Amino acid sequence: MKILHTSDWHVGKVLKGRDRLEEHEAVLRSIIQIARDEDVDLVLVAGDLFETSTPSPKAQGLVMRALLALKAEHRHVVAIAGNHDNASLLDSVYRPVLGELGVHILGTPKTPDSGGTLHLETRAGERLTVAAMPFLSQRYAVRAAELLLHEHAEHALDYARRVAAIVGMLTAQFSPDSVNIVTAHATLLGGRRGGGERDVQTAFEYEVPSSIFPSTAHYAALGHLHRQQEIPAPCPAFYSGSPLAVDFGEEANEPGALIVTAAPGTRADARNVPVAGGRRLRTLRGRLDQVIDEGEQAGDAYLRVILAEQARAGLGDLVREKLPNALEVQLDDANRPRPGSHGGPDRPSRAGRTPAQLFGDYLSEQNVGDERVERMFAEFLDELTDGSPAT
């Protein structure tokens, strides 16, 4: 059987004030066409359907139409929540509504009998078992362990062991006469960041070993890291990568999806399929005349411009006049005004930095080296950005 593995759509993403909904529409059309051209039996969306936990009506409509189009022609579709998604929204609205139409949505981890392990059959009568593990926040991990594993909080396991225990429960029903798939939105040890992930939820507290996946699985379909890659594991385990570069840190990534071929008793094979529709992101560095020349040859790519020029009034406006697709203009390190200098505070250096990075800068300035403070801030930020239900 053939499986389409995609993840990290981030529909609703706004890049430096530029709406990208038209790009996402084109990207999802490309993914739908891949499903048709490859005549796949199953589509897996391994989390982060949306960019934010409060997606706009237009973003929601786009995702819903895409999922229904992927379901056409008797394909199975399984989608799980990522750390950017609102798990409650997916469970309370998308799951019952799209479930009636044959699309399987999981916002939070479920027991095997409640939809955490799906037993499906392809058009050709082949058996297919899917163990689905949505993103699990530190905060919700305790609650999930209580509900799914009947673990008491006072005997709490650490995060990685909780995730491993839940995956073990979900994959316990794998059988040798079925194609066994596990899908998860998680950070695996050894995985390479793509450049646009939410740092607080790729930190070491969230890393889990690839040994959580059993050798009885034919394939592990992963989401969260935006760079397509294989992770050494007891079974073939891949991140599909994002089909759209979501930030300038991902400009070198090639947008794509994976087509997986699997059968009982054999090792699954995965191959990349390019996804079209997204605009390229490029960083241009150099003197003003150099970056303008390069930018004029960059087509419709969105640009980040880093100038080797002395600060002067109107420089950024001049670049944007010549290069309308320049979304960010800053000076290089050698020419950037320093804090307390005549040029004022070092505002450009803050561009694109995450809250966790900015808080780390503040702690360094205050000579605070207590890791507990950073961990508490990470947990606080996690609660603010997490769409899981409160415990």
Q: What are these regions, as identified by a protein language model?
A:
Residues V14-G17, L49-A66, A81-L101, L106-G107, ...:
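Metal-dependent catalytic neighborhoods of phosphoester/phosphodiester hydrolases
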Residues D37, L42, A262-T391:
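Accessory, non-catalytic peripheral segments of nucleic-acid enzymes
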Residues G116-T129, M133, C235-G299:
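Binuclear metal-dependent phosphoesterase catalytic core
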Residues T6-S7, V43-D48, H76-N83, H104-P109, ...:
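Active-site neighborhood of phospho(di)ester-bond hydrolases with catalytic His/Asp-centered motifs
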Residues H10, V40-K58, H74-L89, L188-F204:
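Active-site neighborhood of divalent metal-dependent phosphoester/pyrophosphate hydrolases
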Residues G99-E100, L188-T266:
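Conserved beta-sheet core of the metallophosphoesterase superfamily
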Residues P96-A203, A263, P274:
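Conserved catalytic scaffold of divalent metal-dependent phosphoesterases
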Residues M1-L68, A72, E379-E383, G387-T391:
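N-terminal active-site segment of His-dependent metallophosphoesterases
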